[in-house]
């Protein structure tokens, strides 16, 4: 893979030019262009660019790797959460809008948001009537129940995706083993379907943000008769506006209009392109070139352009760019189950050793995010500004790090391994900068790269693999599952979130006090009161030194002037909202 790094001097100069320009432009709040892509830089952050209902054409996405899965019940990449809504309608979703409006949860397959009862421990939803799959059969509440069962209670088959519903729904006695092992018609008793258009969820405790939780694709319907486990991804049946025409693993997916989709029971979707093509495993520089040449339209992964492209765009003051934030943190997880990181002093030594400015520069400089010191990003409600491991100018403190290495019984340092995703050059560059920082205090780091599509299912997200291979450090980016402190923190710091595969609590943190604070807080119906507690949880996590915050992620997109309805949605980590993108 080609290196995407440029010298720090060239990059910083380009960033300085761009920041000066963007301070003058202010963006296009109306989102209106002249039809030739003349909207200002950041126009899609503050508005909708080229709003249009024009139909037709083939919309082309490209990705630098294969996703973990297009199966809505077996994915945990944000871009698939975003994209899957085209063919899998969850009960709720986020409004396709910029700014604060984009963080609002709205009904999708459900007629309205949920009706809580039993103090918030029971939630009832009514499904829209007349919603049909691509084969013409009608969607029922039993299909939604089955979708939840297969995605949350069959982790040996579907290892990816959040585990909230498995954690918080009341379990059967004896324990429910999922639909592939439990062949009973009743299934999970805590999900009731009194009729074809009503579904009731019964939880172990009150859960104030349940509407947000159901915005993930695990609440999309899957008819039991059509499911064949791991092979379902090969012939997904659509409940959305588009359906799969073909899917070739590691090559491409092609979607066409679902002829049975009805705008009358779907107020969110427009069904604009004739066809949608997703090309997989395309080199990032090639993606950037294709976007600029008009040969493709969107980088579906949404991690931003390569550094060389970034420098060119910023130096030329290209207006077809969006520099967006979206509740996301770039960090390094420290594995508490791999020695010597089972000792908190050794973890703290790493915290002090890292030169975060060098890491930030390796990732692309300030335009890609400010240096971070907390787990909660600055745009998540409940964020509190603090720095537990403050160092001079954020460039590390070698003396303090060596002092802590001595305290943890490693005065001469030690060897460990750090993982990064091999299709993400910026992530590898950051790992390289960390490697250099740790070398200064005697910690020798080997960088091990793995494919993004298998990063959680086979490698970094498999505790046994990380322990067997003595992987002590793991590069990670995390965007909130929904824009609250709980939606950000729970799956990365709660002990119950640790899984055998598809694990996202990479540090394997299991602190009873932190677990209890999260559980107790989500039961509180007062949002302001919940927000206050999340800052306290953040501080306790940082005291454990299991996460090294690196940058508060910002993305630099190239916005194709050929697309319509371009809007950067913070709910999708600043990605363009894929629900209604069309072509001029």
Describe each model-derived feature in a short phrase.
Residues 62-118, 237:
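N-terminal lobe/hinge region of extracytoplasmic solute-binding protein
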Residues 112-164, 200, 340:
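Aromatic- and charge-enriched surface segment that lines or borders ligand/interaction sites
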Residues 283, 406-480, 553:
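Ligand/substrate-recognition segments at binding pockets and active sites
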Residues 43, 248, 353-384, 426-436, ...:
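Detector for C-terminal structural segments
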């Amino acid at each position: 893979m080609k290196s995407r790094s440029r010298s720090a001097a060239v990059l910083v100069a380009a960033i300085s030019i761009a920041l000066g320009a963007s301070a003058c432009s202010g963006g296009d709040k109306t989102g209106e262009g002249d039809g030739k892509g003349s909207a200002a830089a950041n126009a899609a952050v503050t508005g909708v660019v080229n709003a249009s209902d024009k139909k037709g054409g083939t919309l082309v996405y490209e990705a630098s790797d294969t996703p973990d899965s297009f199966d809505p019940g077996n994915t945990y990449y944000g871009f698939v959460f975003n994209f899957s809504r085209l063919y899998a309608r969850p009960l709720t979703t986020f409004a396709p809008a910029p700014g604060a409006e984009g963080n609002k949860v709205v009904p999708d397959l459900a007629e309205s948001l949920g009706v809580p009862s039993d103090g918030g421990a029971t939630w009832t939803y009514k499904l829209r009537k007349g919603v049909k799959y691509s084969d013409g059969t009608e969607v029922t509440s039993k299909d939604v129940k089955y979708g939840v069962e297969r995605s949350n209670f069959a982790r040996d088959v579907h290892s990816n995706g959040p585990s909230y519903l498995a954690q918080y729904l009341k379990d059967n006695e004896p324990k429910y083993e999922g639909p592939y092992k439990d062949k009973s018609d009743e299934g999970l008793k805590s999900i009731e379907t009194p009729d074809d258009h009503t579904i009731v969820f019964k939880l172990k405790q009150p859960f104030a943000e349940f509407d947000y939780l159901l915005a993930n694709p695990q609440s999309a319907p899957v008819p039991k008769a059509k499911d064949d486990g791991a092979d379902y991804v090969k012939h997904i049946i659509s409940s959305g506006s588009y359906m799969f025409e073909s899917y070739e693993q590691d090559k491409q997916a092609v979607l066409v209009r679902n002829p049975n989709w009805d705008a009358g029971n779907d107020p969110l979707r427009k069904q604009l392109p004739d066809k949608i093509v997703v090309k997989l495993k395309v080199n990032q520089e090639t993606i950037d070139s294709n976007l600029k040449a008009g040969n493709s339209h969107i980088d579906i992964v949404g991690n931003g352009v390569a550094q060389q492209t970034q420098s060119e765009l910023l130096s030329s003051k290209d207006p077809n760019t969006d520099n967006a934030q979206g509740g996301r943190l770039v960090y390094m997880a420290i594995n508490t189950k791999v020695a010597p990181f089972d000792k908190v002093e050794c973890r703290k030594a790493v915290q002090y050793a890292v030169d975060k400015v060098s890491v930030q520069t390796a990732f692309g400089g300030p335009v890609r995010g400010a240096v971070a010191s907390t787990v909660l990003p600055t745009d998540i409600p409940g964020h509190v500004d603090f720095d537990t491991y403050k160092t001079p100018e954020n460039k590390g403190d070698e003396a303090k790090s060596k002092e802590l290495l001595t305290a943890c019984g490693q005065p001469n340092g030690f060897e460990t391994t750090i993982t990064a995703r091999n299709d993400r050059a910026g992530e590898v560059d950051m790992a390289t900068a960390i490697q250099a920082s740790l070398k200064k205090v005697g910690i020798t780091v080997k960088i091990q790269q793995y494919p993004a599509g298998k990063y959680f299912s086979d490698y970094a997200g498999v505790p046994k693999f990380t322990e067997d291979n003595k992987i002590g450090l793991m590069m990670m980016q995390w965007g909130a599952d929904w824009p609250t402190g709980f939606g950000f923190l729970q799956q990365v710091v709660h002990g119950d979130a640790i899984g055998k595969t598809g694990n996202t609590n990479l540090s394997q943190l299991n602190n009873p006090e932190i677990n209890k604070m999260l559980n107790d807080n989500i039961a509180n119906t007062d949002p302001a009161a919940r927000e206050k507690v999340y800052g306290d949880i953040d501080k306790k996590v940082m005291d454990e030194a299991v996460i090294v915050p690196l940058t508060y992620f910002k993305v630099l997109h190239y916005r194709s002037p050929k697309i319509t309805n371009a809007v950067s949605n913070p709910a999708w980590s600043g990605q363009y909202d894929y629900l209604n993108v069309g072509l001029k």
